[in-house]
Amino acid sequence: MMRFLNHCSQGRSAWLLMILTALILESSALYFQHVMKLQPCVMCIYERVALFGVLSAGILGVIAPKTPLRWLAIILWIYSAWGGLQLAWQHTMMQLHPSPFNTCDFFVNFPSWLALNQWLPSVFEATGDCSVRQWQFLTLEMPQWLVGIFAAYLVVAALVLISQFFSRK
């Protein structure tokens, strides 16, 4: 299995699949926001940024999968998936255990050199409350789904990282 993952990581198909999954998830988020009129909260925006990190890792990987750039893509993938998992878990806890002491910020807080909410407010501006449950599918709220999604990204990324130390046949 590890040799297979190593082989896949050195081809473009697996990276394109990762790009496709991230694009579908980002498109779903924009559909929820602009068509279904669900208001994204600060945590939703941060989770969206983590998903863009996974998307960026896929783009890096597809550019040159047989070069050391692949290692940078894998590291970005792990970093983004881990960050997204932490954010989704924290968001889930806010929704499952609401408390006046456990709230999210009123506004997104990006660094001045990366003011995404000012550059593209239709995608990165938060207008909702993190503790409000707006959407449910199969008894799970959106942050709970994201916990599973980011956990899956993280597990696959860790396996791909480990597979890099197995030689290709």
Swiss-Prot record:
Q: Does the keyword Transmembrane apply?
A: yes
What does the record say about its membrane topology?
Answer: Multi-pass membrane protein
Q: Residues on the Periplasmic side?
A: 32-49, 90-144
Gene Ontology MF annotations: electron transfer activity; protein-disulfide reductase activity
Any single Gene Ontology cellular-component annotation = plasma membrane
The protein's predominant localisation is membrane
Where, subcellularly, is it found?
Cell inner membrane
Q: Pfam families, alphabetically?
A: DsbB
User: TM segments?
Assistant: 15-31, 50-65, 72-89, 145-163
What is one Gene Ontology biological process annotated in the Swiss-Prot or TrEMBL record? protein folding
Keywords, A to Z, come to:
Cell inner membrane, Cell membrane, Chaperone, Disulfide bond, Electron transport, Membrane, Oxidoreductase, Redox-active center, Transmembrane, Transmembrane helix, Transport
Q: Which residues lie on this side of the membrane: Cytoplasmic?
A: 1-14, 66-71, 164-169
Q: Any S-S bridges, and between which cysteines?
A: C41-C44, C104-C130
What function is annotated for this protein? Answer: Required for disulfide bond formation in some periplasmic proteins. Acts by oxidizing the DsbA protein.
Q: Which NCBIfam families match?
A: PRK01749.1 (NF002485)
What is the protein name stated in its UniProt record?
Answer: Disulfide bond formation protein B
Q: Which organism is it from?
A: Photorhabdus laumondii subsp. laumondii (strain DSM 15139 / CIP 105565 / TT01)
